[in-house]
Amino acid sequence: MKIGVFLPISGRATGPETLTQAAQSAEQQGFDSIWSADRVVTPWQINTFYPYSENHEFIVPPDRPFLDSFTCLAFLAGCTEKIMLGISVLVLPYRHPLYWARVAVSIDRLSKGRLIMGVGVGWMEEEFAALGVPFKERGKMTDEQLEIVEKLWSEEHISYEGQFYSIQDVAFHPKPIQRIPIWIGGEGMAAMRRTAKYGDAWFPYYIDITAAQLRERFDTIRRMAAEAGRNPDQIQLACCRAIEVTRDAVPQEETRLRGTPEQLIEALNAYREAGVDHIALQFMVPRWPDRVEQIERFASEVMPHVR
């Protein structure tokens, strides 16, 4: 099982020194990937149901600095050598596919084939409104974008006619070094169907799920893929999970990753046994220095035992 760690691309301590240290340390410690999140703008008033916290309220203050995910990964491509560079996840309707496909290929080539494209439809209706993008059409827009990008990265004369995008006989060069993996974010049935049709991996971020439940839902995706004529073995199971390393043993819940190194080894091995190919971990510690300490403990005391 490969293991990734989220980067500090938001917060007042964020800057080139912190990012460089975080990425280079992760590479030296043996992590397989580093991850950035996506945000364009944060409205002051947010009423949309937030799916990634227990009280369903968005936990990031509107005035918290938030760096662009693509820019951070391009910067870190030159500061690292082998670690994979991932986005979790790019909200596709926020950008035209011709634009982000170009940026993605540029990062892939500058990093010598290390980019992972986590993609999703987005959730914050207020952010869609600020960008002038129709919230209710985000799923259809995402599907069209995935079809377009597949053409851009593989064909010479690219044309596409859809409900939202129209492209007539354009060239797109250079092509990516690798076949840039598309990891589909999202937890609902629509995201599962999208993974079965377009994805190289399913990449959900659940706050409350067991490894066995995750596997059960992935098996549903595999069945959908087979019904669509795809080889299910071409789709990987990946996931994002929040994690906390504690000093003392705590009561264990199958739906949480929280505990001592020994407890986390047992919990993460359940994910490995469930067939998870890659897990991206978000260490839930507010202050970056404290997070550094947790990441170091995890890398030395947990990671060697859960590969």
Predicted features by range, described:
Residues M1-R307:
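Active-site-adjacent structural elements that line small-molecule/cofactor binding pockets in enzymes
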